Swiss-Prot record:
Native organism: Archaeoglobus fulgidus (strain ATCC 49558 / DSM 4304 / JCM 9628 / NBRC 100126 / VC-16)
Family listed: Belongs to the universal ribosomal protein uS9 family.
GO biological process: maturation of SSU-rRNA from tricistronic rRNA transcript (SSU-rRNA, 5.8S rRNA, LSU-rRNA); translation
Gene for this chain: rps9
Gene Ontology molecular function, alphabetical: RNA binding; structural constituent of ribosome
Name this polypeptide is given: Small ribosomal subunit protein uS9
Length: 135
């Protein structure tokens, strides 16, 4: 039996996590068992498609299955694009593709570490304070 190359990678954004499984195939991409072509909203779909457009020839030769959980829909989309880009890079081992990803957007390969500041007492949020009266 021939060895089938399967690569599993993950990506994170805020509290969202995505796991991508990539294997040789016909170019099918599914996000939570839904084809990426009908994934809603459109802005999230465009974010997910970015690494696939950059790695055009490779993306047509592999099937990608992405499972996302946690966070909001946009954070899930950004976690999914990171997972897809890492999977494509690990599957191909192409240094040119790595340079193309980094040149386009560094967060395709590196998780965005920004987090929400916690709310502090004396106000409604992390920075906003209650109005004070001095007379």
């Amino acid at each position: 039996m021939s060895e089938m190359k399967i690569v599993v990678t993950s990506g994170k954004r805020k509290t969202a996590t995505a796991r991508a499984v990539i294997k040789p195939g016909k170019g099918r991409v599914r996000i939570n068992s839904v084809p990426v072509e009908i994934h809603q909203p459109e802005l999230a779909r465009m974010k997910i498609m970015e690494p696939l457009i950059i790695a055009k020839e490779l993306a047509e030769k592999v099937d990608i299955e992405v499972k996302t959980w946690g966070g909001g829909f946009m954070a899930q989309a950004e976690a999914a694009r990171t997972a897809i880009a890492r999977a494509l890079l690990e599957f191909s081992g192409d240094e040119e593709l790595r340079k193309a990803f980094l040149e386009y957007d560094r967060t395709l390969l590196v998780n965005d570490v920004r987090r929400k500041l916690p709310k502090i007492q004396g106000g409604r949020g992390a920075r906003a304070r209650r109005q004070t009266s001095y007379r």
